[in-house]
Amino acid sequence: MKAAEIREKFLKFFESKGHTIVRSSSLVPGNDPTLLFTNSGMVQFKDVFLGAETRPYSRATTAQRSVRAGGKHNDLENVGYTARHHTFFEMLGNFSFGDYFKRDAIHYAWELLTTVYKLPADKLWVTVYHDDDEAYDIWAKEVGVPAERIIRIGDNKGARYASDNFWQMGDTGPCGPCSEIFYDHGPGVWGGPPGSPEEDGDRYIEIWNLVFMQFNRDAQGNMTRLPKPCVDTGMGLERIAAVLQHVHSNYEIDLFQQLIKASARETGVADLANNSLKVIADHIRACSFLIVDGVIPGNEGRGYVLRRIVRRAIRHGYKLGRKGPFFHKLVADLVAEMGAAYPELKEAEQRVTDVLRQEEERFFETIEHGMSILEAALADLDAAGGKTLDGELAFKLHDTYGFPLDLTADVCRERGVTVDEPAFDDAMARQREQARAAGKFKATQGLEYTGAKTTFHGYEEIAFDDAKVVALYVEGASVGEVKAGESAVVVLDHTPFYAESGGQVGDQGVLANAATRFAVADTLKVQADVIGHHGELEQGVLKVGDAVRAEIDAARRARTARNHSATHLMHKALRDVLGSHVQQKGSLVDADKTRFDFAHNAPLTDDEIRRVEAIVNEQVLANAPGIVRVMPYDDAVKGGAMALFGEKYGDEVRVLDLGFSRELCGGTHVHRTGDIGLFKIVAEGGVAAGIRRVEAITGDNAVRYVQALDARVNAAAAALKAQPSELIQRIGQVQDQVKSLEKELGALKSKLASSQGDELAQQAVEVGGVHVLAATLDGADAKTLRETVDKLKDKLKSAAIVLAAVDGGKVSLIAGVTADASKKVKAGELVNFVAQQVGGKGGGRPDMAQAGGTEPANLPAALAGVKGWVEERL
């Protein structure tokens, strides 16, 4: 049974049991800033389990794309060397949100494994938490698993509830026992059952974990039963595929075999068991899907992890003899294997390929030199019998050649060598480098709020009377009142304030009553449906239970709405002008501007920018109405609405039709496109490989910008004594005049240099049959210096010459040596002798070289030393 069929059967089985098939969420978590990557099926449901979000279904099933590389969950260094470690994997799961519990979860799992997948029942073992008698009895008395194949696992990690069979979301919150299902590969494979001293062997392999969330743990460690217990299960697709395909390594399943063959094709390796091929096959999955989800190789956070994975794959290809870009060519093979299950991969194929190719080209520019340095160091270390690589060298490889520390460590590990990481860290600190380790994401200080959700009125109103204060927070702690001068977060039962999301900034404004006034500087979400008003109490005392009038800064909101609506129109215009590959990769919409990041591999031309502006302004002039509808997500997407990168959507979504644009959006917008007034792009540039950024302004900001531009044009025209309409023509005339004058100046300099050259030739000193000359040529540029050196070489026949010129505190140097003398006196060495004394460096051919410097005060002494330097070499 192939992996694709296993995935399909899993989802269809649970759909037949009343579960809603929910699409895989992004690898970039939209609801958990503490998590680097989505690493399990439950991540997208975390807020549901915590009660902060509701869904229209109580049963769900998913095939979740997951990554474990960086931070707490880091499998990177093991990938390729073990049978079951991966950076990217698929987690099959079924979930119950207060619906069914242990009995159904266990029966469903058993039915799927034994009836649908047809695994022999006598090959399956199960574990339960040691005091979970309920689960034990279901397995033993209802399912019929013999007692000798049911193992109770106690607290085996040093504390109460610290067990492989007790799951906890964190130090507090939902938790509960779990039951794991193992497959027995038989006595031909070494290993013992779970809980035994030999449990780390490969005979008994965990294939499914059933988590029963039935408790809530408070800060004191007390456990209370949840009113609605939940189920969260996870089964790795690669693991169950290995079992069903009767192989012992995940890399032997059909999906990986095709990618390994493709890796062998691109690297020219015949041995398909080579570990480096496994590394490459694994890494193309992680890298491709991370790029699909908007991650771009970089030097921080997620981008840094992606860069590490890409470079690790490249290094293994290099190890196999591939000295040029190859990794990006595997994207097509991955699409062939997984494109049907994940259409987003196929849609992004060209973009993924381009990003990987660019990253490869960048790395291959430095890898050969860096690898040669590392190989030489390891050879020296081996000769000396050493086992630890100098941390300073590891840092040099990182700083100069772009080798992440773990890449250097990976190479060393293959030679039985470790890296002196403390020394590396010391070097990093001294250099004050900003490259950060992958897991340093900082969680925003959470506010513990358990009340009702906030009712948002901001789509219709700019103010709400009699809003009730339901919670107050000062420095993250819940308080009963706030005094004048204190900064706080206020939660209301009703508000017109929009909380920052979807790239749009939060509202500002005022909360006030007869006795108090609270200035709102920002509005952020405390939970999915709970809005926090951040600011300072300017007067009075504000207490929980007080009623206030909540009023936003309407002018600021209007400017923000104009920019947000213009962003939608610009997005559509960019797709029309550049192509359908354009996808939003980030945005910031505030009252001053809109900043829009999107997937595209080339700078926009002036013509493309003008076309985008024209299309958007045409939509503005059409004064089309903005129409908002709420509908199921699937219906919205089928109807042509665009879903945007980084956004987390529920099953009911808000669709905005604005002119020719249709997008899913929860932000605030203009009522008609004409309200935008005027649209103007003011900046365009690149922010990462394959990602461009456009900044634009609207309304009164755009009018002021155009007026200022007009004023500058008028001022420039006046300075050139021309009418504004004649400015381009006049600039052309001035440029022609400048070129003519530069040509005339060059001729004069050449004539002057020629006459000076005749005089300089007389200053040459003969040393060992070679004329040596070191002098300053006043007013000469680099071209004049070179021409003069050539003339002097012709005149003197056998010579070693250094000429210098000083301009604006900078030294220019040219050295020339005739062919007969260049075997002993090389121009590159000669010019560097002088350059080092004037704060510079240079180089070139044995007969001609140039250099520069920044310390002209040292030039006379440096030139005076040339005669002796040449004399030593003749």
UniProtKB/Swiss-Prot annotation:
InterPro entries: aa-tRNA-synth_II/BPL/LPL, Ala-tRNA-lgiase_IIc, Ala-tRNA-ligase_IIc_anticod-bd, Ala-tRNA-synth_IIc_core, Ala-tRNA-synth_IIc_N, Ala-tRNA_ligase, Ala_tRNA_ligase_euk/bac, DHHA1_dom. The keyword ATP-binding applies. It catalyses: tRNA(Ala) + L-alanine + ATP = L-alanyl-tRNA(Ala) + AMP + diphosphate. Its cofactor is Zn(2+). Keywords: Aminoacyl-tRNA synthetase, ATP-binding, Cytoplasm, Ligase, Metal-binding, Nucleotide-binding, Protein biosynthesis, RNA-binding, tRNA-binding, Zinc. One of its GO terms (biological process) is alanyl-tRNA aminoacylation. Its main location: cytoplasm. Its EC number is 6.1.1.7. Zn(2+) binds at H564, H568, C665, H669. One of its GO terms (molecular function) is ATP binding. The keyword Metal-binding applies. CDD domains: AlaRS_core (cd00673). It is an enzyme of class 6 (ligase). Binds 1 zinc ion per subunit. GO terms for cellular component: cytosol. Catalyzes the attachment of alanine to tRNA(Ala) in a two-step reaction: alanine is first activated by ATP to form Ala-AMP and then transferred to the acceptor end of tRNA(Ala). Also edits incorrectly charged Ser-tRNA(Ala) and Gly-tRNA(Ala) via its editing domain. Belongs to the class-II aminoacyl-tRNA synthetase family. Consists of three domains; the N-terminal catalytic domain, the editing domain and the C-terminal C-Ala domain. The editing domain removes incorrectly charged amino acids, while the C-Ala domain, along with tRNA(Ala), serves as a bridge to cooperatively bring together the editing and aminoacylation centers thus stimulating deacylation of misacylated tRNAs. This is Alanine--tRNA ligase. The lineage of its organism: Bacteria, Pseudomonadati, Pseudomonadota, Betaproteobacteria, Burkholderiales. The gene is alaS.
